């Protein structure tokens, strides 16, 4: 069957190592859109963190955010699917991991939130400067993150714990954070590929959201293609009719994908779209 919809991860997939959308990749996306293919950015970022390069691209109407916890219709500026976490358990988890060497974040609705102390810690993270700047610009600061989460009308779409590293480059406190998180059966967690864990309701996944959007649009699983590089892309790579892994992807992702393409610094996502969808 012909490909009618493509779910695309951003960091490490559509964007190169400098967090840029190349002119060639943009051209291929525009060709796909002109051919009637539904292009769906699928990211761990919140709605407010969707880069303008994609949010403003003509023909991109839908986006999957926070690892599949929500789907937004950009044209109508509304959420058309959401699965949020339990508020009380989320606040408790944040309190229990607060003393660890991490940068905490909570995504409620379209926004990401953090405390000022964690905003100051961003500089200590082992990230490229473009990603640090994205974190600084896309988070709202609250005085007490667990209390903020508890006081909202609904639970967060996602929590994130980003690990500080020791002199040897090893994540500090990651094992303890994973141990604590593992005690919450109602949650699942994955790595976003940047030295972190991303925590969602156990029913959440990019693949689940992609299939739900396909259902709403009348698109079958066999007509859906997904491209990604990290553990948080596994759900859609495995559930789509055609799952594509980037050459720079994590080993487990490359093993589970149907096919491989070039790296994000080689316009690999564009090459896959050309080969399998155009």
Task: Report the location of each language-model feature.
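Short, well-ordered alpha-helix to beta-strand connector turns
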Residues: 3, 60, 101, 156-157, ...
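Short, acidic loop-to-helix structural element flanking the phosphoryl-transfer center
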Residues: 19-36, 82-89, 142-147, 201-215, ...
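Short, structured coil segments at secondary-structure junctions
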Residues: 56-59, 67, 75, 183-185, ...
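Active-site phosphate-binding/coordination module
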Residues: 20-129
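Mg2+-dependent phosphoryl-transfer enzymes with acidic/Ser/Thr/Gly-rich catalytic loops
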Residues: 1-5, 21-22, 197-278
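Active-site metal-binding loops of divalent metal-dependent hydrolases
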Residues: 12, 68, 228-230
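Conserved acidic, metal-coordinating active-site core of Asp-based
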Residues: 96, 102-103, 107-227
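Asp-based phosphoryl-transfer active-site loop
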Residues: 4-18, 93
